[in-house]
């Protein structure tokens, strides 16, 4: 395979079937735009050039790519062949191998791309390599007519003979060619068809007419699944999630009800992790070995240390870091919370913008009050502190090591190491008051009924 590789990614379609203000190829799969799934696979090849052909909503694509690829604009949009031609300027002087990919076909593995490039560099020097597949239902696809692994003809379903329609090998649209061959062939493509468009597939028939060979590489249908509608987007998400679940279990995680666990593209799981039903991982989650995540948790942007227990019904928000063997229980929410080894918040607690030392315990109903309507403030809690139930810690504040905050306290000033802080109104005891109150109210109610 040549060391000089370029990738042209076609993303100029309007995506009208998505019915969205967001560009079609930026709709997320596993919390990542589908285009970036494809670009990650492309990057595994270390290409010298990456060109994304854009049309509608080009500003969205430019922002999403963040300068990692050159943009070429197709305006007007006159077919796939015309789209590829728009990348010629960006590839001026490039004399290596070119992959032609589609932004709405996001799951093409790098290994498949390598196979196409390897075939392009074979001794028989094909002019074009076509990526083909055999779908369950070939009705909507153009056919690839072959002799061995040579492509002798490409034909759309509507134009195919009965014999050609019986062929199950279909065109994915993805191709590879030498840069000089690609643009020379494209220059000869015409719009002599009903749609008055320049079709990329015509370069195969032109090359064959010149006596040049064209080759085929076959792949799995799932690798070239296209996404043009919300239903196809949902199917792609399901496909990706099924793959990730299998990968997680093969890597040593136990999923009690795999079909109910949802991962993001970058979720990392250690060994001997147990995940109960209905757990959702947003982006940026790292889970160490031996963690138990109980049912109905939502976790994003969090790092969970070895041996931790999370949930059920817990929410870990971005910036959460749990030390070894920490416990976050039911109806606990954390955000920008760094919790040391063995910290326990077992129920009904909010911990935001807080750093907590090892072995500190939070009683039910504890809240770090971190926002005054304008700014966020931080809470610092030392090791082995005990925060009693129904306590409000008003930031900015520091609670010292080994300190105790008594239940029901609203703490607004720092608590020293080893100190007890009790902020609670004196209990008022009035014997018989409740009996007299009930008696008076019953009499009043009876009088109103007369």
State the predicted function of each range.
Residues 59, 67, 108-194, 201:
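Conserved core of the sugar-phosphate nucleotidyltransferase
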Residues 29, 101, 421:
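Catalytic metal- and UDP-sugar-binding loop of GT-A-like glycosyltransferases, i.e.
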Residues 309-450:
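Glycine-rich hexapeptide-repeat left-handed beta-helix
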Residues 3, 168-269:
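Conserved alpha/beta core of the MobA/IspD/sugar-nucleotide pyrophosphorylase nucleotidyltransferase superfamily
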Residues 1-20:
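N-terminal nucleotide-binding beta1-loop-alpha1 segment
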Residues 1-6, 32-118, 123, 442-443:
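Conserved N-terminal catalytic core of the sugar/cofactor nucleotidyltransferase
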Residues 260-325:
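Acidic, glycine-rich loop-and-beta core segments that form the ion-binding/anion-interacting portion
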Residues 10-11, 53, 101-102, 130-134, ...:
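Short beta-strand segments
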